[in-house]
Amino acid sequence: MTGAQLSDTDFERLDPRFGWMRDYLAMVKPPDLLPGRQHVDPHAFGALLAFVNLVDVDRHGEDYRFRFRLVGTHQTIAAGREITGRFLEDAVLPQFVDRIGRNMRLAVDSRQPVYDAFPMPHPGRDFIATERVYFPLARDGSTVDMLLIVNAYPGDVDLNRVLLPPQPSRRPHT
């Protein structure tokens, strides 16, 4: 399932935070369109916000560059450094740039969530196992301009601990 698009069955086998985010985004999105950043209320995430990254998709013709706009506090702690504002190639170890870039491009091009798992891609942090889902966001409902990444750390009970908030009972945006 590495670097793969996800089915409902896949989500059932993964950390519950990934399914929570899938369900939240499905609830807030306009009918038949992708959700955009404007539909996302970070207050609804509760403690899950500490595990969330937002990445800007800078389009250059057929090419993309990815810049970390927001990095959750747990992600910063796990990485052992701050990567907010950095482009992908400056944010992670060189041996992970292609893999993470492929995942991001797949989420952008397919307009579907993408899952991957690998060691933490930061200096001296490869002892931390990570898994993540890249969720596409599109301000216009169609062209992906941002990725919302949810991170989990399956091998570290303390770092991975999160109490998922209840799903809002109504659509916060119409």
Could you tell me what each predicted segment is?
Residues M1-A91, D98, R102-T174:
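Intrinsically disordered, low-complexity terminal regulatory regions
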